[in-house]
């Protein structure tokens, strides 16, 4: 009996020693995290207006930038807002699919699946861009080009969902023929405009860069939201009782707020150096855009549930399949545009270094 107790105590002693060594093991396994640096210690390309500190140094190993997810720096809120939003979209859709016994192969479900895919894509591309862009100048351009591809994919995924699930009959009768082709073109134009502006203009950025970004994206938004805006306006004029229409209303409002903070560097413009880690405009843009996407998701799930009969009356399997194939065509065109401009950037950087 005594021997058994001594053996057990010996085992516990070894386990205790291992536990005491655990922090050291974890520390050795993680990369050494360099301190963040002020704007004067990073190249001009990485500097943001009115953001004085919190920059990650360039030129380190990839794992440093991945592990900077847990470091305090001026991009970490941008990363976490879209990471949490992506997880929320995924979990909400999974719960909906389980509760509704979603028919995955049904024609009726295809636009919904593409909308979910597009939402996860844009959120993931965005968080990767903000997490990894500090590695080098080429990485900076590459990941922001990927971000712009994600935005174009999300724009068209939203257009598909709005067209198939959310449009009312009066709007549909007038615009059904050219809405999706125009939405696909505007989605590509948004990606091309953002990529070109990133490639063409250097910091400090001129106003023309913002125009190249905002105008195509604004046109895409106006077109993509038109079926929803028309339905919401009619609903509110008639004393709206539709729950989905209220979610669509929130979607529009949150997007407009996010667009303001994307276009204007506030509040950091009025408090330079005070909003470096938390509170600058791009972080607020990310937060409101995430809430916009979650509101949009709720509205589309309600439309998917409640308007199936309208869907079946309007759309045959062939038209739905063709529209869904165009989603992947748009993604390929946007990716090709980004790859072309990345090639030009790489050639320019190589020439500069030689």
Swiss-Prot record:
Q: What are the recorded GO MF terms, alphabetically?
A: nuclear steroid receptor activity; steroid binding
Question: Which residues point to the Cytoplasmic side?
Answer: 1-75, 133-174, 235-243, 305-319
Membrane topology value: Multi-pass membrane protein
Pfam families in UniProt: HlyIII (PF03006)
Which regions of this chain are Extracellular-facing, per the record's topological domains?
97-111, 196-213, 265-283, 341-354
One of its GO biological process terms is: response to steroid hormone
Q: Which GO terms describe its cellular component?
A: Golgi apparatus; plasma membrane
Residue ranges of the TM segments = 76-96, 112-132, 175-195, 214-234, 244-264, 284-304, 320-340
Q: Where in the cell is it found?
A: Cell membrane
Function of the protein: Plasma membrane progesterone (P4) receptor coupled to G proteins. Seems to act through a G(i) mediated pathway. May be involved in oocyte maturation. Also binds dehydroepiandrosterone (DHEA), pregnanolone, pregnenolone and allopregnanolone.
Q: Which family does it belong to?
A: Belongs to the ADIPOR family.
Record protein name field: Membrane progestin receptor beta
**Gene name in the database record:** PAQR8
